[in-house]
A protein has these predicted regions:
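Thiamine diphosphate
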Residues: 1-162, 167, 178, ...
Length: 310
């Protein structure tokens, strides 16, 4: 691991490249450009940037209209506001007609920290995953966030991409894998337990696997960056190989990655199964590291939970 960079920062940098090479891409924000990092586009290419103020629903409806004219709108706001305030518009104005709009939501999960439970969205993956035809992505690091941003610009259809406020380690060497929509990446092979993780929890899962190795437990770690459509073939293969499955997400254990993996395995693979995430609770204010620990989402806590459930 090397530098720590937030996935939202990589997203902002990728947008600069996109608008410079693709004249169809436009960037929309709802008065949070400095936080979502779309400010980079606003400064470098103001003709490509639209600030709608605190009006997320209007922003999404406008993006839907833009898409009918052949543009590729990237809408940015906090996950709480995308999944909360603009949900009807995302469902009915974007997904229902299957318009080519990208909803890129930052500040997701409890790692938002001091902003508190009102802003720590732990329901967004579930809400977006249930919308018919919606592709749902949660990058693990800055490199993957940039690659995903570039990839979804070329993908025709509605996309929800979940991004983080917190700066986290950028993968290096063998950990850097190609980003292909709908294809999981195996970051560590193992035979005793398969850990399926997404977003910031991928790095924590790798650290947890190191802890498990000290006790002779050989854990595989698989990065599920595309939660929908999930890589069912990969999930099935590793569940069958290990016979024990753990899912890890900085999201409610209801409706997110854990349920997506369970849907694949149910009735097909006989294995032990346990979900690690936020257990039917709201978040709370505090430093990101402290809040993650409060919800059992640090590597040492995860290792202990995994040992107790395999």
């Amino acid at each position: 691991m090397a530098d720590k960079i937030a996935t939202r920062q990589a997203y902002g940098e990728a947008l600069i490249e996109l608008v410079e090479k693709n004249d169809k891409v436009v960037v929309l924000d709802a008065d949070l450009a400095n936080a979502t990092q779309t400010c980079k586009v606003a400064k470098a290419h103001p003709e490509k940037f639209y600030n709608f103020g605190i009006a997320e629903a209007n922003m999404v409806d406008a993006a839907a209209g833009m898409s009918t004219m052949g543009l590729v709108p990237f809408c940015s706001t906090f996950a709480m506001f995308a999944a909360g305030r603009a949900y009807e518009q995302i469902r009915n104005s974007v997904a229902y007609p299957h318009f080519n709009v990208k909803i890129c939501a930052t500040h997701a999960g409890v790692s938002v920290g001091e902003d508190g439970g009102s802003h720590q969205c732990i329901e967004d993956l579930a809400l977006m995953r249930v919308i018919p035809g919606m592709t749902v992505i949660c990058p693990a690091d800055a490199n993957e966030a940039k690659a995903a941003t570039m990839a979804i610009a070329d993908f025709d259809g509605p996309v929800y991409m979940r991004l983080a406020r917190l700066a986290t380690p950028v993968f290096e060497g063998d950990m850097v894998k190609p980003f292909v929509l709908g294809k999981a990446n195996v970051l560590r092979e193992g035979k005793d337990v398969a850990i399926f993780a997404t977003g910031l929890m991928v790095n924590e899962s790798l650290l947890a696997a190191d802890e498990l190795a000290k006790d002779g437990i050989d854990a595989a770690v698989i990065n599920i960056h595309t939660i929908k459509p999930i890589d069912a073939e990969c999930v099935t293969a590793w569940a069958e190989k290990c016979g024990k499955v753990i899912t890890v997400e900085e999201h409610s254990v209801i409706g997110g990655l854990g349920d997506a993996v369970a849907d694949v395995l149910m009735g097909k693979v006989n294995c032990k199964f346990h979900k690690i995430g936020v257990n039917d609770q709201f978040g709370q204010s505090g430093k990101a590291a402290d809040v993650l620990r409060e919800y059992g989402l640090t590597a040492d806590q995860m290792a202990a939970t995994i040992k107790a459930n395999i």
